[in-house]
Amino acid sequence: MGNYLSVDCGGTKTAFLVCVERGEKKAYCVLGPANYMVNGVKCVMDILKDGVERVCGQAGIKREELRSGFIAIAGFGDIPEDMPGLIRQAEELFPGLPLTLGNDTENAMAGSLLLKQGIHVIAGTGSIGLGCGRDGVQ
């Protein structure tokens, strides 16, 4: 059974989850804020490294036992020129781990709407409303 990593980097906290293919939670931990535009890229990478080590330790696995990971970063994609650097640094931090980076809104919509049509409103440290139509367009 494969182990999968999900990370939600936000303005108030960063949540780490390891689950198995069926979605069963193996481990979960929360660390401090990781918004690269506020806290800086180095802070985000430090929190990612620490959090992944912690959540894998709680799950009783080595980082190399993760099959893939999704890292949701607040503000990711808002400044397109920042994306390649963030992707490169995350890939260097976790060599060999297939990673996808995305905006925290993508993470939220996937979780709440299960990739189906609907509206999702986030009212956290920052606020935003999003929608996804029948055609899958956001």
Residue ranges of model-derived segments:
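Conserved phosphate-binding catalytic cores of ATP/NTP-utilizing and phosphoryl-transfer enzymes
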Residues: 1, 96-121
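Short glycine-rich, Thr/Ser-proximal phosphate-binding strand/loop in the N-terminal lobe
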Residues: 3-50, 138
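Short glycine-rich anion-binding loops that position phosphate/pyrophosphate groups of nucleotides
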Residues: 12, 75-76, 125-128
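Short, conserved beta-strand segments within well-ordered enzyme catalytic domains
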Residues: 17, 70-72, 100, 120-122
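Alpha-helix C-terminal capping segments
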Residues: 19-21, 111-115, 135
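Short beta-strand-loop/turn "lid" adjacent to the catalytic site in phosphate-handling enzymes
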Residues: 55-93, 112-113
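Short, active-site-adjacent cap segments at secondary-structure transitions
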Residues: 78-79, 107-109, 128-129
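Glycine-rich phosphate-binding loop of actin/hexokinase-like ATP-binding domains
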Residues: 115-138
